Structures are given as C-alpha cells and as structure tokens.
Amino acid sequence: PRGSPRTEYEACRVRCQVAEHGVERQRRCQQVCEKRLREREGRREVD
C-alpha cells in the first residue's frame, strides 16, 4: 500500500535535500513538500 501522507512527506524532504544544495535547502524543501502534501490531501477530499 501507499505510505501515509506523513511518511511520504518525510521521504519527499529526504529526496529534496539530496537533490538541493545551499542554506535555504531545508526551508525550501519543507515548503515544497508541504504544498505537495496539501495538494494530494485536497484531491483526495474532492474525489
């Protein structure tokens, strides 16, 4: 089965921080992954 949204969020941050570099990396990854998480949850509610 798919991981929980929280698990997917953590995995997103890990992948993002591997791909990104720099001081802003952690905050930018957090914003990107939170946005993605909200969009996924929003779609699930609409379905």
From Swiss-Prot:
Residues of the site described as Cleavage: R2, G3, E45, V46
One GO process term, biological-process aspect: defense response
Domain of life: Eukaryota
Gene3D superfamilies the UniProt entry points to: 6.10.250.890
Entry function: Inhibits protein synthesis in animal cells.
Cystine crosslinks: C12-C33, C16-C29
Transmembrane feature ranges: none
Keywords noted in UniProt: Disulfide bond, Glycosidase, Hydrolase, Plant defense, Protein synthesis inhibitor, Toxin
Subunit structure, as described in the record: Homotetramer.
Catalyses which reaction(s): Endohydrolysis of the N-glycosidic bond at one specific adenosine on the 28S rRNA
A GO MF term: toxin activity
Enzyme class: hydrolase
Enzyme Commission number(s) of this protein: 3.2.2.22
Name of the protein in question: Ribosome-inactivating protein luffin P1
